[in-house]
Amino acid sequence: NLNESRADLGFIASLPGRKILLRGNHDMFWDAKKTRLLNELYKGKLFFLQNNYFTYEDPSRNVHALVGTKGYCYEGKDTPEHFQKIVKREQERLRISFESAAADGYEHFIMFLHYPPTSIGEMESCFTRMAEEYGAELVVYSHCHGEARYQDSFLGEVNGVDYRLVSADYLNFRPEKIME
């Protein structure tokens, strides 16, 4: 729960730099109803990315909207009905992020997902189609752990979108610079 997470969130907030958090599959303290509260509690220190967007300006003064959601991919554990229910929910959350940013005039997007953008063996998904529809320049994702899983989804450019895996073990626990 949130009370149990306060010490960890406080530690992360105390670290230097901007911290934008995206919900993962183990983040039980955070549900969609708490996003606004979390952003109020940690204003200026942490930003919780869900059903919203974050503005990023690079050194060349290009402005991007950072959008994202947890996402979901099929790993063989779900019934088709349960899988589709979760994907539909996550797709809607991502659309809310894109639409909010677009309504505020943003044209450049960086998309974040916790899960890979496709299930194993898929050549597209609702998430990749949405990245293409809104013109996301980059999709950053994680969740793939262990060498056997690193190739589960896209790496590099596909249909004009750059896909980057940033799972900690894939990066040898070193931060990845994704933009200037």
Which residues are covered by each model-predicted region?
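Binuclear metal-dependent phosphoesterase catalytic core
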Residues: 56-60, 85, 132-134, 146-180
